[in-house]
Structures are given as C-alpha cells and as structure tokens.
A protein has these predicted regions:
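N-terminal hydrophobic targeting/anchoring segments and the immediately downstream early-domain regions
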Residues: 1-136, 140
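Substrate-binding cleft of carbohydrate-active enzyme catalytic domains
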Residues: 141-148
Length: 148
C-alpha cells in the first residue's frame, strides 16, 4: 500500500459507533483516524475514553487497532483494520500536572491539541480576545511532549 488516508479529527467515530461508522470510512478510503478521546473532560473521563478504545480493539481486532507508531498504522491499513490514533482536542485532562503528559503517553495518547477555544492552564484558545499564547506551564508541556 503506497498511500494511507488519515482522518485528522475523526470525531464521528467512537467505540459505540464502530459497527455503523467503519463501513462508511472504508468506502471513503479512510484507513486511520485521530480519535478524539477528550477536549474539556477531566482526567478521569479522559482515561475512561482511552480505555474504551483499547477495549474495542481487544473485542474487535479484525476491525480496529489502537496504534502508537507509524509502522503500526501502516500495517493496520494494509490489513484493512482501522487504525485509531488516540487524540485530545485540548489539554484540560492534564490539569496542572506535568507528569500526566507521560501518563497519557503510556496509555497511548499520541496527538494533543494544546487549547480548545478558551483559556486553560496551558494557554489561550482561539476564542480568547487577549491572545496571550502559552503559559509557563504550557511551555513546559510542549517541552515534555518533545522529549517523549
């Protein structure tokens, strides 16, 4: 397989809609997606959402696989299995705990949008008039993300 189509924000698919959504994605040529597991949710809710994807992958290994590396994504696509890339649309689940960057990474998180519309511990979102950018904590989060 030479080309892989990845939905950069697959908000329409979740573990509960797998059986109905996957046929549409396959017909559309989508092999993988950044599956949103959190945006403004608490740490606990985000962990639960990630766990639902791992559970779905365990229950339906012929349909979905949680991937954490590019070779895994390519292999899943070549096998006709949807590759789910764990994604946050905001860093709210981190709270102000830098160690949670590592914890979520261990759970499979590979893409995290830093802010989602409003100001938070990491920085200002796009709807904030002051446009203050990243906070000190936000810069630490970015640095840690680059290290892992």
């Amino acid at each position: 397989m030479s080309a892989v189509c990845v939905d950069g924000c697959a908000t329409g698919i979740n573990p509960r809609t797998l059986t109905t959504e996957l046929p549409h994605l396959k017909r559309g040529g989508v092999h993988a997606g950044l599956v949103t597991t959190a945006a403004l949710e608490t740490t606990e809710v985000a962990v639960g959402a990630i766990n639902q994807w791992w559970r779905a992958a365990r229950l339906h290994p012929d349909q979905v696989r949680v991937v954490t590396r590019v070779p895994e994504l390519r292999a899943a696509a070549a096998e006709g299995v949807f590759a789910a890339v764990i994604h946050f649309q905001g860093s709210v689940p981190l709270g102000t705990d830098l160690e949670l960057v590592d914890a979520f990474h261990r759970l499979g998180l590979r893409v995290m949008q830093l802010t989602y519309n409003y100001a938070g511990p990491v920085g200002d979102g796009c709807l904030e008039e002051r446009d203050a950018g990243l906070t000190r904590f936000g810069r630490q989060v970015v640095e840690r993300m680059q290290q892992i």
